[in-house]
Amino acid sequence: TGCVHTAPGFGADDYVTCKRYGMDMVVPVDDQGKHTDYAGKYAGMGTDESNPVILKDMKESGMLFASEEIIHSYPHCWRCKHPIIFRATPQWFCSVDSFKDEATGACEDVRWVPAWGKDRMRSMILERTDWCISRQRRWGLPIPVFYCDDCSKPVCTDESIESVAKIYETEGSNAWFEREAAELLPEGFTCPHCGGKHFTKETDTLDGWFDSGSTHYAAMERDQGFWPATMYIEGLDQYRGWFQSSLLVAVGALGRGAPFKECVTHGWTVDGEGRAMHKSLGNGMDPAEIFNKYGADLLRLWAGSSDYHVDVRCSDEIFKQLSQNYLKFRNTARYCLGNLDGFDANDLVKPEDMLELDKWALTRLNKLIEKAFAAYDEYEFHVVSHLINDFCVVELSNFYLDIIKDRLYCSGKNSLERRSAQTALFLILDTLTKMFAPILAFTCDEIWLSMPHRGSDDARNVVLNEMNKPFAEYALDDAEMAKWDALISVRNDVNGVLEKARADKRIGKPLEASVTLRASGESKAVLDKISDMDLKELLIVSECLIAEDDAADADAVTAAGSYNPGLTVSVKEAEGTKCPRCWIHSKDADPETGLCPRCKAVLSEAN
């Protein structure tokens, strides 16, 4: 057992306890933080001022057992950082018990992003107490209540509200502070309780959350077609704030459902170490400085690359890393634009004529489109950014763009081989530019104004065009894509041995190499899948052979595959003459010019 200090006027827990036992709600401290007359000899003293006096009196009277200073967690003002006390005061409340079921039911009709938002909102509504809607501030929207000077009872009737509302329509809510009570009420108005004729205005203002929670009515009621709002988006703290107040006002005051169809929440922007940004810490970042140093689109890319459902880190180091992703996309676009010069976007190669490698690229693009659309639908912008970056790096730069350089640079200008690659490049660039435009608005518009367009496009601005849907007519089936997966795994093994040969000074560039592939076990099936492909083009070497024997060339660099156990790759210097135009080593080169048969034919046709 023990004695517990209980002060119902200075703490919520004590208030509830004393209310349960019918104890008086004593509050011997006024609005200025000074003791009232109830405190006797301590009246007029501030609470901090009275503490040592009370201790002294207790000690002198023999009532003080012990006195000691301790360090403990204590509430402080968020603005001035001084310690505060809690004090019970008369307030206006809105009871939510009568419509909690309706409010939680309204949550079911909302799409919450992230999905756990629904359960969070429901639990907060179910657990909340009455809503205190009054504030003791000198600014804000006044609570339109009057007090009868005769009986002291509050007065708020349809007649008084209508009178105040008409004045607000012409003078605004400041009229409450500028006019006397008699000027705000209808002529001859009397107290409905006692018939009194003299009144005093309420001095409290309305809770700002009640104010903001009513904005959906003010903003959209005039145009019924816009209610409810398509989306509310704010920080995680607004489940207790704007989201909840808007929902409660819509359900409790208007008798409607939720005032929004979707509710999206985000975390906070913090520094590189995860700390909140404060002036006192000096860890904030000025957007203007980011614009000047990196450009506006990089700030947009930072926002579009961050998982905003949690706190988002922001630092100069992060912007430096993102600038590499930005440059990768920009360089990819520049490569495409450079190779689309003179291309007629209204004369695409037909699906049945397109080369299989180009179809592979468009099939991979189709997968990107499907995933990006799904991510956009869920407002997962960071997923879109990462998908596009991976596509530019893995599928394009590391594989496709490297291979088609030869066709783009060395095949005939109007040849099927070159136009097939250009068609794929155009569809890729067109898709990426439209897809990335919501995030990289300025860069994508710059690209859009520089690229060729189809007749159905609006050439003025990229955002005036719908995003591309998958190009099903150009897609490869699963079996065909499996063949290309096998080719990529073999290519990875070959590249590893090519690097080893370069390190051993056996070759310079890959085009100086002749590659021989030998397989055993499961790897034989892999080679069988790709045996009909133009391996020297796809591996970017001058020659590629598939050998049945197990004997590797003595003068070759030979190594086992890492991706395909049982695959052996041998690399040696290619025989023949190096073509001065395409750099491929050919045994059939022209003895006078050194041109390979392909380049000789292209130049002859051009002349």
Residue spans of the language-model regions?
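Cys/His-coordinated zinc-binding microdomains
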Residues: 136, 152, 195, 583-586, ...
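Short cysteine-rich clusters marking metal-coordination/redox-active sites
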Residues: 77, 148, 191-194, 579, ...
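Residues immediately within or flanking Cys/His clusters that coordinate Zn2+
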Residues: 74, 91, 143-145, 188, ...
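C-terminal accessory/binding modules appended to enzymatic or scaffolding proteins
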Residues: 561-590, 595, 599-600
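Short functional micro-motifs and their immediate structural scaffolds
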Residues: 85, 156, 198-200, 584-590, ...
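Residue patterns forming the tRNA-binding/recognition surfaces of aminoacyl-tRNA synthetases
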Residues: 2-161, 174-181, 242, 275, ...
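Alpha-helical recognition segments enriched in aromatics with Gly/Pro capping
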Residues: 21-33, 137-139, 161-311
